[in-house]
Amino acid sequence: MGEIIDGKKLAKEIQEKVTREVAELVKEGKKPGLAVVLVGDNQASRTYVRNKQKRTEEAGMKSVLIELPENVTEEKLLSVVEELNEDKTIHGILVQLPLPEHISEEKVIDTISYDKDVDGFHPVNVGNLFIGKDSFVPCTPAGIIELIKSTGTQIEGKRAVVIGRSNIVGKPVAQLLLNENATVTIAHSRTKDLPQVAKEADILVVATGLAKFVKKDYIKPGAVVIDVGMDRDENNKLCGDVDFDDVVEEAGFITPVPGGVGPMTITMLLANTLKAAKRIWKMN
């Protein structure tokens, strides 16, 4: 029976550490600031942004929310981002995705100053990640690495398989595992003999967006299984990309959904914002 990795507990520990560090900085008259830009009225995005704000304030940081209507022009959004780039009280900028179709996400991400790109999506940060240089790492992949390490697993020398090749999770988490000296395979919808490929993994990260896609026959006994999915099953119950009940018997460690990867994402955003503030103050 696999041990369940408690993402809530780990996220709380990291957040407490960030909060303590912020409190020390505030004593010196320095307060990290995070600005979130929300375009339109997507309810899921709104809920997510509210959570980010609440957690930012709990950590003792300045939290700014800028709301823009669905029909805002691309030009207006870019000018808002440019103003935030110049704002000395803001150290992290996050534009909540997805954006309306008439706005280029690429252009918006490219406009965010890479020193304030706490989502880790700017091409400079992506490039730095790939050459192994210190950078802002996308929050979910950063959280995944912390979850793996929390099990006591030595990543170096392990076989890691990542199912999913998105720019937000699959590719960056594969690169982080490579930077930790794992031997990494990226698998996807066109991979032949996927269960065989997955079964070689000491560390399996699943980010397919398909409910309960990974079954027990994908799992090497004792593997660390990280489930990035947020899906609904046939009974409309929240589940992941891994069939938890089927896989938990084979796995050594496994993240649940909910309560696994999810809580780590906002926590790593706070860690990135603190890091951004410290870097900006050091440069100045």
UniProtKB/Swiss-Prot annotation:
Protein residues bound to NADP(+): G164, R165, S166, S189
Molecular function terms from GO: methenyltetrahydrofolate cyclohydrolase activity; methylenetetrahydrofolate dehydrogenase (NADP+) activity
Keyword Amino-acid biosynthesis assigned: yes
Gene Ontology CC entries for this record: cytosol
EC assignment: 1.5.1.5, 3.5.4.9
Superkingdom of source: Bacteria
Biological process annotations from GO: L-histidine biosynthetic process; methionine biosynthetic process; purine nucleotide biosynthetic process; tetrahydrofolate interconversion
InterPro entries attached to this UniProt entry: Aminoacid_DH-like_N_sf, NAD(P)-bd_dom_sf, THF_DH/CycHdrlase, THF_DH/CycHdrlase_cat_dom, THF_DH/CycHdrlase_CS, THF_DH/CycHdrlase_NAD-bd_dom
Record's keyword annotation contains NADP: yes
Pathway, per record: One-carbon metabolism; tetrahydrofolate interconversion
Catalysed reactions, as listed in the record: (6R)-5,10-methylene-5,6,7,8-tetrahydrofolate + NADP(+) = (6R)-5,10-methenyltetrahydrofolate + NADPH; (6R)-5,10-methenyltetrahydrofolate + H2O = (6R)-10-formyltetrahydrofolate + H(+)
Keyword field: Amino-acid biosynthesis, Histidine biosynthesis, Hydrolase, Methionine biosynthesis, Multifunctional enzyme, NADP, One-carbon metabolism, Oxidoreductase, Purine biosynthesis
Subunit structure as annotated in this protein's UniProt entry: Homodimer.
Task performed by this protein: Catalyzes the oxidation of 5,10-methylenetetrahydrofolate to 5,10-methenyltetrahydrofolate and then the hydrolysis of 5,10-methenyltetrahydrofolate to 10-formyltetrahydrofolate.
Family: Belongs to the tetrahydrofolate dehydrogenase/cyclohydrolase family.
Protein's UniProt name: Bifunctional protein FolD
Species whose genome carries this gene: Listeria monocytogenes serotype 4b (strain CLIP80459)
Gene it is expressed from: folD
